[in-house]
Protein backbone atom coordinates (compact mmCIF):
# COMPACT_ATOMS: atom_id res chain seq x y z
CA UNK A 1 0.00 0.00 0.00
CA UNK A 2 1.22 3.50 -0.87
CA UNK A 3 0.95 5.29 2.46
CA UNK A 4 0.19 8.84 3.56
CA UNK A 5 3.16 10.92 4.71
CA UNK A 6 3.76 13.26 7.61
CA UNK A 7 6.84 14.47 9.53
CA UNK A 8 8.85 12.45 12.05
CA UNK A 9 9.37 15.38 14.43
CA UNK A 10 8.57 19.03 15.04
CA UNK A 11 10.93 21.53 13.39
CA UNK A 12 11.16 25.30 13.63
CA UNK A 13 12.72 28.13 11.64
CA UNK A 14 12.61 31.91 11.60
CA UNK A 15 12.43 34.26 8.67
CA UNK A 16 11.09 37.63 7.59
CA UNK A 17 7.51 38.39 6.54
CA UNK A 18 7.31 39.77 3.00
CA UNK A 19 4.52 42.18 3.93
CA UNK A 20 5.53 43.37 7.39
CA UNK A 21 9.30 42.97 7.24
CA UNK A 22 9.08 41.54 10.77
CA UNK A 23 10.57 38.33 12.16
CA UNK A 24 8.27 35.31 11.86
CA UNK A 25 8.66 31.97 13.65
CA UNK A 26 7.52 28.98 11.59
CA UNK A 27 6.78 25.63 13.28
CA UNK A 28 6.04 22.45 11.31
CA UNK A 29 4.24 19.69 13.24
CA UNK A 30 3.48 16.05 12.38
CA UNK A 31 -0.23 15.25 12.03
CA UNK A 32 -2.30 12.03 12.06
CA UNK A 33 -3.63 10.34 8.92
CA UNK A 34 -6.40 12.20 7.06
CA UNK A 35 -5.65 15.51 8.81
CA UNK A 36 -4.59 17.14 5.56
CA UNK A 37 -2.52 20.32 5.28
CA UNK A 38 -3.47 22.85 7.98
CA UNK A 39 -2.02 26.36 8.22
CA UNK A 40 -2.43 27.92 11.68
CA UNK A 41 -2.00 31.48 12.95
CA UNK A 42 -0.92 31.40 16.59
CA UNK A 43 -0.71 35.21 16.80
CA UNK A 44 -4.51 35.22 17.13
CA UNK A 45 -6.35 34.28 20.33
CA UNK A 46 -7.67 31.66 19.99
CA UNK A 47 -5.42 30.40 17.14
CA UNK A 48 -7.13 30.18 13.73
CA UNK A 49 -6.76 27.17 11.40
CA UNK A 50 -6.79 27.42 7.60
CA UNK A 51 -7.08 24.00 5.93
CA UNK A 52 -5.57 23.96 2.42
CA UNK A 53 -8.61 24.25 0.17
CA UNK A 54 -8.88 25.51 -3.42
CA UNK A 55 -12.01 27.51 -2.55
CA UNK A 56 -10.24 29.42 0.26
CA UNK A 57 -7.46 30.77 -1.98
CA UNK A 58 -7.21 34.49 -2.74
CA UNK A 59 -4.56 35.90 -5.03
CA UNK A 60 -3.18 39.30 -4.16
CA UNK A 61 -0.59 41.34 -6.03
CA UNK A 62 2.14 40.09 -3.70
CA UNK A 63 1.19 36.53 -2.80
CA UNK A 64 -1.36 33.77 -2.34
CA UNK A 65 -3.53 33.86 0.78
CA UNK A 66 -5.94 31.47 2.44
CA UNK A 67 -9.05 33.27 3.72
CA UNK A 68 -11.69 31.88 6.09
CA UNK A 69 -15.42 32.68 6.36
CA UNK A 70 -14.69 35.58 8.76
CA UNK A 71 -12.31 37.15 6.19
CA UNK A 72 -9.28 36.34 8.37
CA UNK A 73 -6.30 35.43 6.20
CA UNK A 74 -2.88 33.85 6.20
CA UNK A 75 -0.53 35.08 3.47
CA UNK A 76 2.43 33.89 1.39
CA UNK A 77 1.60 30.18 1.56
CA UNK A 78 2.54 29.30 -2.03
CA UNK A 79 6.23 28.35 -1.76
CA UNK A 80 5.80 26.20 1.35
CA UNK A 81 2.80 24.54 -0.31
CA UNK A 82 5.02 23.74 -3.32
CA UNK A 83 7.59 22.10 -1.01
CA UNK A 84 4.82 19.97 0.54
CA UNK A 85 3.69 18.92 -2.95
CA UNK A 86 7.26 18.20 -4.00
CA UNK A 87 7.84 15.83 -1.08
CA UNK A 88 4.30 14.44 -1.08
CA UNK A 89 3.44 15.50 2.49
CA UNK A 90 -0.23 14.67 3.11
CA UNK A 91 -0.62 15.59 6.78
CA UNK A 92 0.99 18.53 8.56
CA UNK A 93 0.17 21.47 10.83
CA UNK A 94 2.03 24.65 9.91
CA UNK A 95 2.12 27.30 12.64
CA UNK A 96 3.22 30.93 12.35
CA UNK A 97 3.12 33.65 15.01
CA UNK A 98 2.24 36.21 12.32
CA UNK A 99 -0.26 36.82 9.50
CA UNK A 100 2.13 35.30 6.94
CA UNK A 101 4.56 32.50 6.19
CA UNK A 102 8.16 33.86 6.09
CA UNK A 103 9.43 34.54 2.56
CA UNK A 104 12.89 32.97 3.27
CA UNK A 105 14.98 33.29 0.05
CA UNK A 106 11.93 33.58 -2.25
CA UNK A 107 12.10 29.93 -3.32
CA UNK A 108 10.89 26.61 -1.89
CA UNK A 109 14.39 25.28 -1.11
CA UNK A 110 14.56 26.42 2.57
CA UNK A 111 11.23 24.69 3.19
CA UNK A 112 12.46 21.51 1.47
CA UNK A 113 15.53 21.47 3.73
CA UNK A 114 13.35 22.03 6.80
CA UNK A 115 11.00 19.18 5.84
CA UNK A 116 13.92 16.84 5.17
CA UNK A 117 15.44 17.83 8.51
CA UNK A 118 12.17 16.87 10.22
CA UNK A 119 12.23 13.52 8.43
CA UNK A 120 9.34 11.98 6.52
CA UNK A 121 7.21 9.38 8.27
CA UNK A 122 4.76 6.99 6.59
CA UNK A 123 1.37 6.48 8.23
CA UNK A 124 -0.57 3.23 8.08
CA UNK A 125 -3.26 4.67 5.83
CA UNK A 126 -3.59 4.74 2.03
CA UNK A 127 -2.48 7.93 0.27
CA UNK A 128 -5.21 9.42 -1.92
CA UNK A 129 -4.32 10.93 -5.29
CA UNK A 130 -6.54 13.01 -7.57
CA UNK A 131 -6.47 11.39 -11.02
CA UNK A 132 -7.56 13.46 -14.03
CA UNK A 133 -10.04 11.57 -16.25
CA UNK A 134 -11.06 14.28 -18.74
CA UNK A 135 -9.43 17.37 -20.24
CA UNK A 136 -10.31 20.58 -18.40
CA UNK A 137 -9.17 23.99 -19.65
CA UNK A 138 -9.61 27.54 -18.38
CA UNK A 139 -8.78 30.79 -20.17
CA UNK A 140 -8.38 34.47 -19.36
CA UNK A 141 -7.80 36.54 -22.49
CA UNK A 142 -4.73 35.02 -24.16
CA UNK A 143 -3.71 33.19 -20.95
CA UNK A 144 -4.76 29.58 -20.41
CA UNK A 145 -4.12 26.48 -18.31
CA UNK A 146 -5.31 22.92 -18.73
CA UNK A 147 -5.17 19.40 -17.35
CA UNK A 148 -5.29 16.25 -19.47
CA UNK A 149 -5.32 12.59 -18.41
CA UNK A 150 -1.78 11.18 -18.04
CA UNK A 151 -0.33 8.35 -15.98
CA UNK A 152 2.10 10.50 -14.01
CA UNK A 153 2.44 14.22 -13.35
CA UNK A 154 3.90 16.32 -16.16
CA UNK A 155 4.17 20.09 -16.32
CA UNK A 156 4.73 22.33 -19.36
CA UNK A 157 4.80 26.07 -18.65
CA UNK A 158 5.38 29.01 -21.00
CA UNK A 159 5.82 32.65 -19.99
CA UNK A 160 5.91 35.65 -22.33
CA UNK A 161 8.03 38.34 -20.72
CA UNK A 162 9.43 40.98 -23.02
CA UNK A 163 12.51 41.92 -21.01
CA UNK A 164 16.23 42.10 -21.94
CA UNK A 165 17.14 39.91 -18.93
CA UNK A 166 14.95 37.05 -20.16
CA UNK A 167 16.16 35.40 -23.35
CA UNK A 168 13.35 34.19 -25.64
CA UNK A 169 14.76 30.65 -25.46
CA UNK A 170 14.30 30.63 -21.66
CA UNK A 171 10.54 31.25 -21.58
CA UNK A 172 9.34 27.63 -21.61
CA UNK A 173 10.05 24.79 -19.20
CA UNK A 174 8.69 21.24 -19.26
CA UNK A 175 9.35 18.32 -16.93
CA UNK A 176 8.06 15.00 -15.71
CA UNK A 177 7.52 15.55 -12.01
CA UNK A 178 9.28 13.54 -9.30
CA UNK A 179 10.46 14.52 -5.83
CA UNK A 180 14.07 14.36 -7.05
CA UNK A 181 13.33 16.50 -10.13
CA UNK A 182 11.42 19.01 -8.00
CA UNK A 183 14.26 19.35 -5.50
CA UNK A 184 17.00 19.66 -8.15
CA UNK A 185 15.30 21.60 -10.92
CA UNK A 186 12.48 23.64 -9.39
CA UNK A 187 12.73 24.19 -5.62
CA UNK A 188 15.63 26.70 -5.80
CA UNK A 189 13.99 29.02 -8.36
CA UNK A 190 13.19 32.36 -6.71
CA UNK A 191 10.31 34.76 -7.10
CA UNK A 192 11.02 37.97 -9.01
CA UNK A 193 9.93 41.57 -9.21
CA UNK A 194 10.76 45.01 -10.58
CA UNK A 195 12.82 47.38 -8.43
CA UNK A 196 10.37 50.21 -9.20
CA UNK A 197 7.39 48.12 -8.00
CA UNK A 198 9.16 47.17 -4.77
CA UNK A 199 10.13 50.81 -4.11
CA UNK A 200 6.57 51.98 -4.81
CA UNK A 201 5.02 49.34 -2.52
CA UNK A 202 7.49 50.11 0.26
CA UNK A 203 6.69 53.82 -0.03
CA UNK A 204 3.09 52.82 0.80
CA UNK A 205 4.12 50.65 3.76
CA UNK A 206 3.78 47.39 1.83
CA UNK A 207 6.29 44.67 0.89
CA UNK A 208 8.52 45.82 3.76
CA UNK A 209 10.36 42.47 3.74
CA UNK A 210 11.15 42.69 0.03
CA UNK A 211 14.89 42.71 -0.71
CA UNK A 212 17.65 41.15 -2.79
CA UNK A 213 17.75 38.36 -0.18
CA UNK A 214 14.31 37.03 -1.08
CA UNK A 215 13.77 37.70 -4.78
CA UNK A 216 15.32 38.23 -8.18
CA UNK A 217 15.12 42.00 -8.64
CA UNK A 218 15.23 43.53 -12.12
CA UNK A 219 15.19 47.04 -13.53
CA UNK A 220 14.27 47.79 -17.15
CA UNK A 221 17.47 46.24 -18.46
CA UNK A 222 19.05 43.66 -16.21
CA UNK A 223 19.06 41.50 -13.09
CA UNK A 224 20.28 43.62 -10.16
CA UNK A 225 21.22 40.80 -7.75
CA UNK A 226 25.02 40.59 -7.36
CA UNK A 227 25.03 36.81 -7.68
CA UNK A 228 22.80 36.82 -10.77
CA UNK A 229 20.47 33.93 -11.55
CA UNK A 230 20.55 30.36 -10.20
CA UNK A 231 19.35 29.05 -13.59
CA UNK A 232 19.31 30.78 -17.00
CA UNK A 233 15.55 30.13 -17.06
CA UNK A 234 14.92 30.80 -13.36
CA UNK A 235 11.89 33.00 -14.12
CA UNK A 236 9.83 30.27 -15.83
CA UNK A 237 11.05 27.63 -13.35
CA UNK A 238 9.67 29.78 -10.54
CA UNK A 239 6.32 30.07 -12.33
CA UNK A 240 6.28 26.26 -12.43
CA UNK A 241 7.12 26.16 -8.71
CA UNK A 242 4.15 28.47 -8.09
CA UNK A 243 1.89 26.19 -10.16
CA UNK A 244 2.98 23.08 -8.23
CA UNK A 245 2.06 24.85 -4.98
CA UNK A 246 -1.22 26.20 -6.37
CA UNK A 247 -2.35 22.79 -7.65
CA UNK A 248 -1.60 21.15 -4.27
CA UNK A 249 -4.22 23.39 -2.63
CA UNK A 250 -6.61 20.44 -2.96
CA UNK A 251 -4.37 18.63 -0.44
CA UNK A 252 -3.56 15.77 -2.82
CA UNK A 253 -0.91 15.06 -5.43
CA UNK A 254 -2.47 15.09 -8.91
CA UNK A 255 -2.04 12.43 -11.60
CA UNK A 256 -2.35 14.22 -14.94
CA UNK A 257 -0.64 16.48 -17.49
CA UNK A 258 -0.63 20.22 -16.73
CA UNK A 259 0.07 22.74 -19.49
CA UNK A 260 -0.07 26.51 -19.10
CA UNK A 261 0.59 29.67 -21.11
CA UNK A 262 1.14 32.93 -19.19
CA UNK A 263 -0.76 31.52 -16.22
CA UNK A 264 -0.43 32.74 -12.65
CA UNK A 265 -1.79 31.97 -9.18
CA UNK A 266 -5.36 33.07 -9.99
CA UNK A 267 -5.66 31.07 -13.22
CA UNK A 268 -3.96 28.01 -11.71
CA UNK A 269 -6.53 28.11 -8.90
CA UNK A 270 -9.37 28.62 -11.40
CA UNK A 271 -8.22 25.45 -13.20
CA UNK A 272 -8.05 23.45 -9.97
CA UNK A 273 -11.54 24.59 -8.98
CA UNK A 274 -12.87 23.83 -12.49
CA UNK A 275 -11.49 20.27 -12.27
CA UNK A 276 -12.91 19.64 -8.80
CA UNK A 277 -16.32 21.08 -9.76
CA UNK A 278 -16.67 18.66 -12.70
CA UNK A 279 -17.26 15.30 -11.00
CA UNK A 280 -16.72 13.22 -14.14
CA UNK A 281 -13.32 14.89 -14.81
CA UNK A 282 -11.48 13.33 -11.86
CA UNK A 283 -11.46 10.57 -9.26
CA UNK A 284 -9.68 9.69 -6.03
CA UNK A 285 -7.31 6.73 -6.39
CA UNK A 286 -5.15 4.74 -3.98
CA UNK A 287 -2.46 2.19 -4.79
CA UNK A 288 -2.08 -1.15 -3.04
CA UNK A 289 1.12 -2.03 -4.85
CA UNK A 290 4.24 0.06 -5.44
CA UNK A 291 4.42 -1.38 -8.97
CA UNK A 292 1.11 0.32 -9.89
CA UNK A 293 2.25 3.77 -8.74
CA UNK A 294 3.18 6.25 -11.50
CA UNK A 295 6.94 6.87 -11.56
CA UNK A 296 6.32 10.53 -10.67
CA UNK A 297 5.41 9.56 -7.12
CA UNK A 298 7.99 6.90 -6.28
CA UNK A 299 9.63 7.98 -3.03
CA UNK A 300 13.26 9.01 -3.58
CA UNK A 301 15.89 7.78 -1.16
CA UNK A 302 16.40 11.32 0.21
CA UNK A 303 12.79 11.57 1.34
CA UNK A 304 12.26 8.32 3.21
CA UNK A 305 15.83 7.78 4.40
Swiss-Prot record:
EC number(s) recorded for this UniProt protein: 3.5.1.108
Effect seen on changing residue 78 to Q: 3000-fold decrease in activity
Native source species: Escherichia coli (strain K12)
Family the UniProt entry places it in: Belongs to the LpxC family.
Keyword Zinc: yes
Pathway the protein acts in: Glycolipid biosynthesis; lipid IV(A) biosynthesis; lipid IV(A) from (3R)-3-hydroxytetradecanoyl-[acyl-carrier-protein] and UDP-N-acetyl-alpha-D-glucosamine: step 2/6
Name of the protein: UDP-3-O-acyl-N-acetylglucosamine deacetylase
Post-translational modification as stated in the protein's UniProt record: Degraded by FtsH.
